[in-house]
Amino acid sequence: MGADNRRTTETGYVNRRGQAVLRDTGLPGNDHNQRTYVLRCGACAHEYGANGSDIWQRRCPACDGGAEGLPY
């Protein structure tokens, strides 16, 4: 997978594990000063919430052993 030069919280950003940012929910995350973003897995299309600070390293909770997503 090629490098994505967007900021990790920008809609459309895809991390090295194939997780794409769909949108900012505007809801607070569970990490200090973070918001919850909706991500979609490129492999299985599962959608889940994640802290903005975690997007760069997230794995899909449905097919790649990632942590459970945040509610949104």
Stretches with model-predicted labels:
Residues A20, C63-D64:
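A broadly tuned preference for mixed-charge, low-complexity surface segments
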Residues G2, C44-E47:
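Intrinsic low-complexity, intrinsically disordered segments enriched in polar/basic residues
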Residues L70-P71:
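Short, charged, intrinsically disordered terminal tails
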Residues M1-Y37:
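Short, intrinsically disordered terminal segments enriched in charged and Pro/Gly residues
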Residues N30, G42-C44, S53:
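Generic structural motif
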Residues C41-C44, C60-C63:
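Short cysteine-rich clusters marking metal-coordination/redox-active sites
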Residues Y48, A67:
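Cys/His-rich microdomains that often coordinate metals
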Residues G49-R59:
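Short linker/helix segments within small regulatory modules
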